[in-house]
A protein has these predicted regions:
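Bacterial N-terminal signal peptides that target proteins for export
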Residues: 1-8
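Bacterial N-terminal signal peptides
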Residues: 8-17
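Carbohydrate-active catalytic/glycan-binding domains of CAZyme proteins
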Residues: 19-501
């Protein structure tokens, strides 16, 4: 593997220095991180020719395991989802192509590890198959002798059957103890997870996440070891960690859980997740940075904080606006639900989403949500509800913690946590209304309109920076969404989303 060209290195250095240098130093332009803003944790990526595919943990959101496609590694479009039913909290998938088939291996928390397959990443994906093995974060690898293995958290692996659809009992073994985190570093502990196995040239590389995925800002990291054989022994890189947050003042916190990926012309990148400093409740976002393989066969970074500045684009950019199609209510691609959901409840026709009401509040009504990913935004929708239904907007962490505004026969409702809403009588018995929620850098406020033109601000607001995993656990984020509770139907139309300064 050759070193990066002098031109490429010069471009990277110039861009790192606050983009000092003409655009000609980056022939395809530049990109800034994140490449997927918002809650897209535990990224796994695969290249098939000139096409890239990626998926992430979906946790308690359903449909799960959205598959993304890109031609340039920067702009991503959702193309399918691999899980149609709710199995539980889905963790740390791995998407790979073995032979002519695509596989996604994944963990269902407190249950087992599973696999789904498809002939193309566009689906359809198979029903999930139980692999009958514990641990988390599965990653398949096929040895030089053709034996299939499944690598797991804690530096362990287990044999797979020839078809890759089950594990072989009695073959679980530990192959690497992980990189020893230096004394004095502030982390959550070793927490070795997220194994990714790649063969480049004559070397097998074991890429692992360590340090804990949340906790203090300096917790997470990417460590690498290598071996001439999948059987080991594994030699640790003298340049570990490849990715890490060193300072609390950095923009990106808890950087880790990396996957290596190459371009057709032999350049290398790593995708991983990180929290944004001060915005934990956006979730772990997906970042991309270039790396290189030195003459001694070790992976190297271009700089400690290269991800904070514009970076030379790897390929000709093909922009895609992820928010542009929210008004189409594409369930499973742009929109999802919290935990189990009956798909027969939803119908989309001529730009109108009709939801069958259920439950009594956002806590048990399975809100329909999307990933905003912006520090400040507002969203609004026109609502037409049956008299027995309660409808509204939320920014939702889980069934206990959410913020929002609804409308029922009793008037306007303010939703906060899992408590009953506070009512304003001025909108009593209104069935047709426009609602808007604004999240202005974690200060949430609500607005309503009776004609879609004249808006009035409601008399409440709340600060939501504490609504995050380090407080509430569950690895969720604050997602904007729609609620239909009570009895009857709610019709949502004219949905709008705006990013704010």
């Amino acid at each position: 593997m050759r070193k990066p060209s002098t031109i490429f290195l010069l471009a990277a250095v110039l861009l790192l220095a606050a983009c000092a240098g003409p655009a000609s130093k980056a022939p395809y332009g530049t990109y800034t991180n994140p490449i997927l803003g918002g809650d897209y944790p535990d990224p796994s990526i695969v290249r098939d020719g000139d096409d890239y595919y990626m998926t992430h943990s979906s946790f308690d959101y359903n449909p799960g395991l959205v598959v993304w496609h890109s031609k340039d590694l920067v702009n991503w479009e959702p193309i399918s989802y691999a899980l149609k039913t709710y199995l539980g909290s889905v963790w740390a998938p791995d998407i790979s192509k073995i032979g002519d088939k695509f596989y996604i291996y994944f963990t269902v928390h407190n249950r087992s590890n599973w696999v789904v397959t498809a002939d193309t990443p566009y689906g359809p994906w198979s029903d999930p198959v139980d692999l009958h093995v514990g641990q988390i974060d599965p990653c398949p690898a096929v040895g030089d002798d053709g034996q299939k293995w499944l690598f797991l958290s804690g530096g362990q692996r287990i044999k797979l059957t020839d078809d890759g659809m089950d594990t072989v009992p009695g073959t679980l073994e530990k192959v690497w103890d992980g990189w020893e985190i230096p004394e004095g570093w502030l982390t959550e502990g070793l927490a070795m997870e997220g194994p990714k196995i790649r063969k480049v040239g004559d070397w097998w590389y074991f890429i692992a996440a360590e340090g804990g995925t949340a906790g203090p800002p300096t917790s997470h990291l990417v460590a690498i070891a290598r071996s001439k054989s999948l059987d080991g022994p594994w030699e640790e890189s003298p340049y570990n960690p490849l990715v890490h947050t060193y300072h609390n003042t950095d923009r990106w916190w808890s950087r880790g859980h990396g996957s290596l990926i190459d371009t057709p012309d032999g350049r290398w990148y790593i995708v991983y997740h990180a929290y944004e400093n001060g915005y934990y409740n956006l979730g772990r976002q997906t970042l991309l940075e270039p790396v290189w393989l030195d003459e001694d066969g070790w992976w190297r970074s271009y700089g400690e904080n290269i991800v904070e500045d514009p970076i030379a684009a790897p390929l000709p950019l093909q922009p895609y606006d992820r928010k542009a199609r929210l008004g189409e209510f594409r369930i499973g691609l742009d929109w999802k639900y919290y935990k189990d959901f009956d798909p027969s409840r939803a119908k989309v026709e001529n730009g109108v989403l009709t939801l069958q009401a259920t439950g009594s509040s956002p806590a048990d009504a399975a809100p329909m949500m999307f990933v905003a990913g912006d520090q400040a935004y507002e969203f609004e929708v026109e609502i037409d509800r049956d008299p027995g239904a309660t409808a509204g907007l939320v920014i939702y962490y889980n069934s206990q913690y959410y913020i929002g505004e609804g409308i029922s026969n009793a008037g306007t409702l303010r939703w906060r946590r899992d408590r009953g809403g506070r009512r304003a009588m001025r909108t009593r018995d209104v069935t047709h209304i426009w609602l808007r929620l604004r999240n202005d850098h974690q200060i949430v406020s609500a607005y309503y309109s009776l004609d879609g033109k004249e808006w009035k601000q409601d008399d409440w607001g709340i600060e939501i920076s504490g609504y995050n995993h380090n407080v509430f656990h569950e690895f969720q984020s604050m997602l904007p969404g729609l609620v239909a509770a009570g009895e009857g139907e709610v019709r949502f139309s004219n949905f709008k989303y705006r990013k704010l300064d």
